[in-house]
Design a protein with these regions (language model features):
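Conserved ATP-dependent adenylate/AMP-binding module captured primarily in the ANL superfamily
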Residues: 134-166, 238-261, 292-307, 382, ...
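Structural core segment of the AMP-binding/adenylate-forming
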Residues: 2-19, 96-97, 124-191, 580
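Conserved AMP-binding/adenylation subdomain of ANL enzymes
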Residues: 236-259, 266-376, 386
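Conserved AMP-binding/adenylate-forming core of the ANL superfamily
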Residues: 62-120, 137-142, 233
């Protein structure tokens, strides 16, 4: 497989191994309490991320840095020179519209090419970008626009524009609104057509690394979103160090033109820093407006990326779809064997690569080769056929699922971070993968475990303040250490494992502390589970609310030759479905003690979605909203 050849070539390069040197600090008992990785990219003393398009245009004007999709499914290449010209034209339009240095422009759109142009144009004009999720309500928009004092808003659709208009109707000064679907980019280009390019050059020259680049509002599960202030230095620390660490694997060693399809919402900081890193490395970027697998899969087959950055949900759906397809053609048992073989093969090969054990036996190699023909190559085909690498973040990825993808020729590196850390604070180093962990500190970053188990982060990626909220800032920043609210542990080599959220820890009536995330992550990795919430605080045992994945339900009905329109109310009561869900529960319980295991569950009708207020835009469950919405079902679990 190409990916394993890549790793062998990379391993022979001694300069790459030195890039992942991790220093650890132990407490008096010998337990690792802190890990830090030296920076690979120097901190900038001048300039800003606004300079990137222009640096690329000067150094490699004909290099293809983006591809823009047309309605017929073709992808038009965009050169560095062309991208810089478009950024300049839109920046001049914003200046002509009245954007002052330090002024804020909100962008409310799904992920599309124009979003990237706007981000760099706002910076080039000396402004600050305020991203808004395209699914935000009028109330959320009202708060973000008012709190940030954004004078301009660029929306994608008429519906988005109407939401902004409604949300800001009572503002003393309504923002000026443009709409991408109604030629916003052309309008801005025409508006600034009379200005000389030098005006943009002058605005860019006034920016420094410490200038605010963006105010990102957290999609918190409770309370009003907080505006996280990130500077150009923050974004540079994240992108430049990540490129230095991963660039040799993603571009140089693979010996193929590197490209990625960006589908994460650009209102999320991970997507934003990804596009900066790609422009730094001149990796081709494409855009897809949806994270939904059914809409994403066709784009993957068209664009054929060499790597992706996604969330566990995507990898779970790809795996589950493969299994459902296999069952439809009578090869469900074969897929299950491929699953088991994949885990064993991935484990054995990694042991050999890391020199911690023997590699796959001849028999295991032969079994892998068979299932590569039957199963694994189909997985690669689903992802476009060229993909070798992926980065997963947002929540833990099931270890066995990670090993399955490894057997399929795709290495998934996990990372961990928050908006406040400019995206990734840790990542699994390419030459020292360790499935089941979220890696070591990103170069230039330190991770510390507090006495109560909370993960603390320090370094160039850490934000400086919440906008207009010094009390909230003081609550999480102490001596430049950011208190994440997550619980975790460092191993002997400085690899971090996240064990849950500090505020989500359940304490049963028997006094047992339970981290619901461990159970929930494993549950979600198994069909037919859609979403779930583990409960049990002040209760005699742990239980779970579980939704069914619609695709899994449709497949389940087909396999059992039941009517496709069978009501969900009947499906959730079917003993056969409950037996299948119990298998997923048993798998989740393998990771915990008996006292922490799920003893009972209820299958609820419907789904947890953004629309019903039970998911955030980044697909995280709003735990308190779910428990409130299903209070009766929870009481019934405990005999109430």
């Amino acid at each position: 497989m190409g990916v394993r050849k890549d790793l062998k070539r990379a391993k022979r390069r001694t300069d790459l191994a030195s890039r992942t040197r991790v220093e650890v600090v132990r407490d008096e008992d010998g337990v690792v309490r802190e890990a830090r990785t030296p920076a690979l990219a120097p901190r900038p003393t001048t300039g800003s991320t606004a300079d990137l398009p222009f640096t690329n245009a000067a150094e490699a004007p004909e290099a293809v840095v983006l591809r823009r999709r047309h309605d017929n499914g073709t992808w038009q290449p965009v050169t560095a020179a062309a991208f810089a010209r478009e950024v300049t034209a839109v920046a001049k339009g914003l200046i002509a519209a009245g954007l002052e240095p330090g002024g804020r422009v909100a962008v409310m759109s799904r992920t599309r090419y124009e979003w990237t142009v706007l981000d760099f144009a706002i910076w080039a004009a000396g402004g600050q970008t305020v991203p808004i999720y395209a699914t935000s309500s009028a109330e959320q928009v009202e708060w973000i626009v008012r709190d940030s004092d954004a004078r301009f808003v660029v929306t994608e659709t008429a519906e988005n524009a109407a939401t902004v208009t409604t949300g800001t109707a009572r503002h003393e000064r309504q923002p000026r609104i443009w709409q991408l679907d109604e030629a916003a980019m052309s309008d801005l280009t025409i508006l600034g057509g009379h200005l000389p390019d030098e005006e943009v050059t002058k605005r860019r020259a006034a920016l420094t690394p410490g200038t605010t680049a963006t105010i990102c509002y957290t999609s918190g599960t409770t309370g009003k979103p907080k505006g996280c202030v990130l500077t150009h230095a923050n974004l540079h620390a994240e992108a430049a160090n990540t490129v230095e660490l991963l660039h040799p694997i993603f571009k140089e060693v693979t010996r193929q033109v590197a490209s990625t399809l960006l589908f994460l919402p650009l209102a999320h900081i991970l997507g934003r820093t990804l596009q900066i890193a790609c422009l730094m490395a001149r990796i081709e970027i494409g855009h897809c407006p949806s994270i939904k697998p059914d809409e994403l899969r066709p784009a993957l087959k068209e664009f054929r990326p060499t790597f992706l950055v996604g969330v566990p949900y995507l990898f779970e759906k790809i795996h589950d779809t493969g299994r459902a397809t296999a069952e439809k053609i009578g090869r469900g048992a074969s897929f299950d064997r491929a699953d088991r073989i994949g885990v064993r093969f991935g484990e054995a090969y990694l042991n050999k690569f890391l020199e911690t054990g023997k590699g796959p036996s001849p028999a295991l190699y032969a079994a892998w080769a068979l299932y590569d023909l039957l199963v694994y190559r189909r997985v690669r085909k689903e992802l476009g056929g060229r993909m070798r690498y992926a980065i997963s973040g947002g929540s833990p990825l099931d270890r066995n699922l990670n090993l399955f993808f490894y057997a399929a020729g795709i290495i998934v590196y996990e990372g961990y971070g928050l908006t406040e850390t400019s995206a990734a604070a840790t990542i699994v180093p390419p030459l020292r993968p360790r499935p089941g962990t979220v890696g070591v500190p990103v170069p230039g970053t330190a991770v510390r475990i507090a006495a109560d188990g909370e993960v603390l982060i320090k370094g160039g990626v850490v934000f400086g303040a919440y906008w207009n909220n010094p009390a909230a800032t003081d609550a999480v920043l102490q001596d430049e250490w950011f208190a994440t609210g997550d619980l975790g542990a460092l191993d002997e080599d400085g690899y971090l494992t996240i064990t849950g959220r500090k505020k989500d820890i359940l304490v049963t009536s028997g006094g047992k502390n339970v981290s619901p995330a461990v159970l929930e992550d494993r549950l979600r990795s198994r069909p037919p589970i859609g979403q779930c919430v583990v409960v049990g605080d002040n209760r005699p045992f742990v239980a779970a609310l579980i939704t069914l994945d619609p695709e899994s339900v449709a497949h389940w009905l087909t396999v059992r030759k039941l009517p496709a329109d069978t009501p969900l109310s009947e499906v959730v009561r079917d003993p056969r479905m409950r037996a299948d869900v119990q298998k997923a529960v048993d798998y989740a319980n393998e990771a915990v003690s008996r006292a922490e295991s799920v003893r009972a569950f209820t299958l609820v009708e419907g789904e947890f979605t953004e629309d019903n207020g039970l998911l955030t835009p980044s697909l995280k469950v709003k735990r308190h909203a779910v428990t409130a919405a299903y209070a009766e079902e929870i009481e019934a679990l405990y005999g109430g």
